[in-house]
């Protein structure tokens, strides 16, 4: 289901004080600064095999929210995995963790927000959980809800 991106500041103004706005100061890494879509989640720690598997599936304009427990010790996404997501129709990635290949990520037509960078590879054992409710930055990310992201931040709204 494709969702049209909307300015997060406008969403905050419309929703009011109960808005679900992520407090983490994430950085933009992808070539698309505005993105939106239904949420799919992955919880993993310094291991990206599961998220690579998810991005291998049709994204249908969705947003993959990855809770890497805030670790920047290893990168969960690099150019190969980001391109996999782009080519399979994902609109964006929100990563509570690190990425690598930052200069190449900027050239890809996919939104990518993450805490920072680290050139170190993650492990590939497949540890992790898919489609669990995850929480970071003061926001609960529930699969199926809608994430909106732009230069101002990330807002999550309940799907209608």
Swiss-Prot record:
Which residues are recorded as binding substrate?
78-81, 100
Q: What remark does the entry make about the cofactor?
A: Divalent metal cation.
Q: What class of enzyme is it?
A: lyase
Positions bound to a divalent metal cation: 101
Keyword terms of this UniProt record: Lyase, Metal-binding
**Assigned EC number:** 4.1.3.17, 4.1.1.112
What protein name applies here?
A: Putative 4-hydroxy-4-methyl-2-oxoglutarate aldolase
Q: Could you tell me which species this protein originates from?
A: Mycolicibacterium gilvum (strain PYR-GCK) (Mycobacterium gilvum (strain PYR-GCK))
Output the lineage of the source organism: Bacteria, Bacillati, Actinomycetota, Actinomycetes, Mycobacteriales
